[in-house]
Amino acid sequence: MQQQNIQPFLKNLVLIGGGHSHAIALKMFAMNPLPGIRITLITSNSYTPYSGMLPGHIAGFYTHERCHIDLRKLASFAQAQLYIDCVTGIDLKNNRVICANRPDVSFDLLSIDIGSTPAIISVPGATKYAIPAKPVGNLLHHWYELVEKISYNPQKPVKIGIVGGGAGGVELALSMLGNLQQYEPNLDIHLFGKDKRLMPNANPLLGNLLRRIFIKRGIIVHLGETVCQIAPEGDIENYIVICESGKTVECNYIFWVTQASAPKWLESTGITTDKRGFILVNDNLQSLSHPQVFAAGDIATVKNHPRAKAGVFAVRQGKPLFENLRRSLLGKTLKKYVPQKDYLSLIGTGDGSAIATRGSFTLPPSTLLWHWKDYIDRKFMDKFRDLPEMGNGALGIGHRAWEGKQTIQNLQMPCAGCGSKVGGNVLETVLRRIQLEQPVNQREDIIIGLNSPDDAAVMKVPTGKVMVQTIDYFTSLINDPYIFAQITVNHCLSDIFAMGAIPTSVLALATIPYGKSSTVEETLFQLLSGALKQLNQAQVSLIGGHTIQGDKLAFGLSCNGLADE
């Protein structure tokens, strides 16, 4: 058979999280394709916020679209699969990612960039009554509601509490005030910090400067105060912030922007972490305990070079992460990455000005610094705008020669003489996995089906009924075989319903992209799992089918239904 344009999948690279590092790495995979590698991005949202622009968005300077990266478009450009789901665990023994709403996802190499969340669990009432700064989507949802309420009735007294005196809390307070001032509201903003100055990890000059700005703008600062409880007080949206000192402050909305923490599910994976639960990595951004795992951004702590959890490091780690993922996939020596010790921070003050600080050096607010920050942020985001619908990506269409080409050439490809069929062992393994996780619905009128497979399926047609049949077949509509199969099932069954019949059984025809057995198995498993989810809901039996390999994922069903004579 002709093979020169075929790029079979040899390895599965799975990326968990759509953080800055992964966004940059995906863009670089699109621009520097690696044939034979299938990339899958698993993320809970299809848009990921850029932290550098988020305060400006809250202040009203940027639209939602301008400060978010479209991961669907980016994944399409990189020809990567995109799974929208929440990760709940990782099986590092069997190299599988456990998701909340879909089958496990197998990997050969894994990278994690899921950011962090504010540590609020230990404070009574915080989880129930406070609004955490992350996930950002939830924060923005509450913020939009608050802006709408204040704009509708600006004279109604509103008290906002912000817990956290670090950079995040400071920028949030200034940005909220900058936006809400346009309504001339009856507004108080309280900021609580456990240290004696704002942004305690920065130089004292910056903390003192910020304190003066807060006083000038009327933001009430409670420094040296550790919040120990959030309690409801009478009416809805009325709470008491209780501090260890005994101080109490009444607030209507409480935003939690404290020290970052890692998700709890990481604890059960067995991966080595630091004391706060973040993944410990070496200078190559590779897990200390599991070499098949890489991590970057807030979720990672570089053991030899620990740094603050700041977006600047996530951005800087994007390129070295890409380089080491690429080298690992090719079996090459990894390259060390040493993060910088000092970095320039440009802090927006919510009014079209910004502060610049690095080390012991600080410049007061100016519009020139804001324009500089705005230029830097827009330049970064422009890298992810106006992307073509599909690039060369990991599939390597029209790719340049690479070190793994010989491996692809040596892969045994199925021949046309055997119909390019998927191997029996692969099919048996997939069906066995599916029966364990999602048993096939077997109707009483099915005499021979998947429970007792033979050369053909056998069905009964009850007296007084007629058989209604239809067939449909589609190439992949989206880059997620699990969802694609569900869409296909619904479309195929709709023709039976349109004839006034009840669907009873289906035969499947699947074309799986070329690859080694493990990658073919993973695709087929995701595809059939999605199909069976919809078939079982419709009480329709999968009774057989045919599976071949080809250059593009495709799926179809021959559907059987019954109707009255």
How would you name each of these model-derived features?
Residues Q2-Q81, E171-P204, L395:
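Beta1-alpha1 glycine-rich phosphate/pyrophosphate-binding loop at the start
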Residues T407-M499, I543, D564:
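N-terminal glycine-rich phosphate/pyrophosphate-binding loops that anchor nucleotide-derived ligands
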Residues V312-Q340:
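Internal hydrophobic alpha-helix adjacent to the cofactor/substrate pocket in enzyme cavities
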Residues V466-Q469, Y473-S476, I483, I502-E565:
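Glycine-rich anion-binding loops of enzyme active sites
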Residues Q2-N12, Q79-G161, Q182, E244, ...:
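FAD-binding core/adjacent interface of flavoenzyme oxidoreductases
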Residues K128-K156, T248-V315, E323:
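FAD-site-proximal beta/loop scaffold in flavoenzymes
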Residues F9, D351-Q406:
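C-terminal auxiliary extensions adjacent to catalytic cores
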Residues L82-G89, L180-D283:
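A Rossmann-like FAD-binding core segment of flavoenzymes
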